[in-house]
Amino acid sequence: LPCGHSKEELEEKGIQVIASNLDTAVADVPAVSGAMTMPVINKEYQYVVDLGGNDVGTLVLGRIKPLLDHAEADFFMVVNAYRPNTSTPEGIIEQMENLEYAAGLKVTGFINNTNLVRETTAECLLHGDEVLKEVTKRTGVPVKYVSYVKDVMTEEIPEGLSGELFPMEFNMRKTWM
């Protein structure tokens, strides 16, 4: 579960949580719940699999990959151009290639999630867009979405950003985070 979130809080918001029932804080190896395959098998589900931005997340993907309909599944890479490993086109491309290799899938699109949490401005979105436009030029992989937190963005969203706008809300992030 995301840091500081409880399963109950998420379920109150209509989100079904599928996670390991092991205490991952003390477990020596990562564990994947068998229920992880449920949304893949039942085509009525709309679901997101958060791989967590590291190699451990590919274990989840390894479990569901054989069941995926590759023609219907998108494999997005979320990019924050203010993170050290994804601050340049070269870094993003390297991370994308590592992710594709580990997952055995091709990235079908980027999500521009360039942010400074509660300090995010229109300039942040423009910076991420500029970096990702160069990545798209080099790889042919398009930007599909631009995500931002509505309450944080007091400025108008810039026009001409690559991708569809995807406004979000802080649901459970504590104000001190």
Each language-model region and where it sits:
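Switch II (G3) loop of P-loop NTPases
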Residues: 20-25, 44-60
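Conserved beta-strand segments of alpha/beta enzyme cores
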Residues: 16-18, 142, 164
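Short, basic/aromatic-enriched C-terminal tail that caps enzymatic domains
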Residues: 160-177
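N-terminal phosphate/diphosphate-binding loop that engages ATP/GTP or pyrophosphate donors
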Residues: 1-28, 32-35
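Conserved catalytic-core segment of NTP-binding enzymes
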Residues: 55-162
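A short acidic, often aromatic-flanked loop/helix-cap motif at beta-alpha or helix-coil junctions
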Residues: 24-27, 118-119, 151-154, 171-176
